[in-house]
C-alpha cells in the first residue's frame, strides 16, 4: 500500500476595534512602536540542479496537507484607555488660523498659548499607501526569488518561536506558508509602523511591490491557496483594498448577517469546503460584534514516488529515554537524497514526492545528541546550506523505514508573534489601507495543525521485485526528528515541525 501524508493547519486571529474615543473624522491615530523589529537574514538562495530524477511509477494520488487561516475583527467593548495617545494629535486643519498678508503676529507674551497661536502648517496624515495590484515586469522577474528566500528565513524564525512556547519534548507542527499568507494579506491593508513591522517579521524587503503577485504565483498543481473576506454591513472597507484583494487573492467580500450562529456556520462551512472537509470547525464561537473575518486555506495534493511495502511491521522508536514499539512503513527502493551534516550532527534525508514536493527529515546521528541540540544549531544560514546540499545530492534507491505519524498541534499565535518581537496586534495596529476605522486591536490568534502519515492512501498498487546489492543505502528513522514539507519548484517550506512521539 502506498503512503499518505495529510497535514491540516488552522490559524485563527481575532481583532477588536476600540471605539471608546474614536474620532469620526480621523483615519488613523497609531503611534510608532518603540520596539525595534528583529534583523532580517539576507542570505542568497542558490539555484537547484534537477538534472537527475528517478522514473515515476504509476501510483494513485494521495491527499496531502490542508491549511486554513482566519482573521476575525470585532468591536472592542472593554473600553481600552488610549486618550493620552489621542490627545497628542494636532487640531484639525480647519481650526488653525490662516494669517493674511500684513496682519501683525500675535503677541505670545501677553496672550495664553493656544492652538491658534501656532503658525499655520499643513497637517501630515499617517503614511498609508494604497494596495498595489500591479507591479512592473522588472520587479516581477526577481520577486519569486526574493519571496522564497524571505519565506525560508521566516520559517526558521517561526520554528524557534513555536518551539519557545511549547513544552520540551512534545510534538509540533505548523505551516509557515499558511501563516505568511495570512500576514501578507494583512500587509495588503497595513500602514505606518504596522506595515514596516510586518515586513520585518516576514523578512520581506521594504516596500516589496510584487509580494502579493509572487505569493499568488506560488500556488501550483501541488499547492493551492484560496482566500475569502467576510465583513459586517457597518464596516466600511476601502474600495482599493476590495479590488486588490479580489485581483490578488480571488476573494469578493461577503457580508455577514445579524445572526452570530448563522455567521459561524457560514464561515465554518467555507473552511470545510476549501480544506476538502479535513477542517470542519475552525471557529467554536463568533462574537456578536464581529466586523471583519479574513480567511485563507492552503490545500496540497501529492503522491509518493514509490509504493511502500504492503506488510505491516512494528519497530522500536526512542521516546523519553525508553524504547516504544510503533507501526513502521518501509520500502526497499525509495528514492532518497541523504547526507550527514556536521553542523547539526544529524542525518538529513529528502524523500521525493510528486508535483515537485519533497518530505525532508533531520534526525540526530549520535545517541547523546538530542533533537533539542539540533534545534539550537539551526538558523537560516545553516538551513539554506542544508537545502542547497540536498539540491546537489542525487536521489538513490534506498532501504527506508519510518514510523506512521500522527501529530496534533495547537498554538496561541499571539505569544508566538511576541516571541518574534511583533506587538502591533496588541498595542498599535494600523490597517488604514483596509478600512477608515482607526481603532482595531487583535484579541486572539490561534494556529492548529494535524499531521498524519500512514499507508492507507491508495486502495491498490502494483508490486514489483527488485534485487539490490549489499551497498544499498539505508535511511532509518527511529528517534525524534525534525521534518518539513518542501516545495522544490519555489524553494520554501510549506509545513515544518518535529516528532517526539509518532503516536500523536
Curated annotation (Swiss-Prot):
Transmembrane segments: none
Compartment annotation: Secreted
Gene3D superfamilies: Alpha-1-antitrypsin, domain 1, Antithrombin, subunit I, domain 2
Disulfide cross-links: 128-432, 135-210
Main location: secreted
GO molecular function: serine-type endopeptidase inhibitor activity
Pfam families: Serpin
Entry-linked InterPro entries: Serpin_CS, Serpin_dom, Serpin_fam, Serpin_sf, Serpin_sf_1, Serpin_sf_2
Keyword field contains Membrane: no
Subunit structure, as described in the record: Interacts with MASP1.
Family: Belongs to the serpin family.
Name used for this protein in its record: Plasma protease C1 inhibitor
Naturally occurring in which organism (per UniProt): Mus musculus (Mouse)
